[in-house]
């Protein structure tokens, strides 16, 4: 008798055919990778096909693969990853799509298929700079409207570019260049044989 994952894998291969770039299993979960050009149609099929019935998008996030595999990775930099749930069939699926252009990462919006994607896509736009084409209200959701850059990108500085503080003379919040100085972290060296009761 086939397991639930084997049944789901067979159903996905039958419904999607050549639109499957890869379909892998790890840690009891399936990950489906599709091309950006097929993304919207695949999502509709995942929701509407009676043998799949993924009624809910429960999460969507951006991923920056710039430093993945310590530089050994040589593929597209940005991806949108969705977690889908079929209540009807009691199974889950991870759906990944890579943005074809690293300079301006654009993928289709899933808001018209799963309305729950709305704020998730805004978050991925805000933090990674992923543009979701067709999104009804794609604007920042976590950072300030005047924020420069996308803070979850691997090339964004840890300390950021600007900081804000309250200026009592101007009686308002002002932005200024970051004043945090880089710290040099020196490891603690224990020089005594019985320091703190430790035996060496």
Swiss-Prot record:
Under PROSITE patterns, the record lists: COMPLEX1_30K
What Pfam families would the database entry show? Complex1_30kDa
SUPFAM superfamilies on file: Nqo5-like
Q: Which UniProt keywords apply?
A: Cell inner membrane, Cell membrane, Membrane, NAD, Quinone, Translocase, Transport, Ubiquinone
State the EC number(s).
Answer: 7.1.1.-
Main site of residence?
Answer: membrane
Bilayer topology reads: Peripheral membrane protein
What is catalyzed by this enzyme? a quinone + NADH + 5 H(+)(in) = a quinol + NAD(+) + 4 H(+)(out)
Name of protein: NADH-quinone oxidoreductase subunit C
């Amino acid at each position: 008798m086939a397991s639930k994952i084997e049944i789901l894998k067979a159903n996905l291969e039958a419904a999607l055919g050549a639109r499957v770039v890869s379909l892998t299993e790890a840690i009891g979960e399936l990950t489906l990778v599709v091309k950006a050009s097929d993304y919207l149609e695949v999502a509709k099929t995942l929701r509407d096909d009676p043998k799949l019935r993924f009624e809910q998008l429960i999460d969507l996030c951006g991923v920056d693969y710039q430093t993945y595999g310590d530089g050994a990775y040589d593929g597209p930099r940005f991806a949108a990853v969705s977690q889908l749930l079929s209540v009807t069939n009691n199974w889950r699926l991870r759906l990944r799509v890579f943005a074809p252009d690293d300079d301006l990462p654009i993928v289709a919006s899933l808001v018209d298929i799963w309305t729950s994607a709305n704020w998730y896509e805004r978050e991925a736009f805000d933090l990674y700079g992923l543009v979701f084409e067709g999104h009804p209200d794609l604007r920042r959701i976590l950072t300030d409207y005047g924020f420069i850059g996308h803070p979850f990108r691997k090339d964004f500085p840890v300390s950021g570019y600007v900081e804000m503080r309250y200026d009592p003379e101007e009686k308002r919040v002002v932005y200024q260049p970051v004043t945090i100085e880089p710290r040099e972290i020196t490891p603690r060296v224990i020089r005594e044989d019985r320091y703190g009761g430790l035996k060496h």
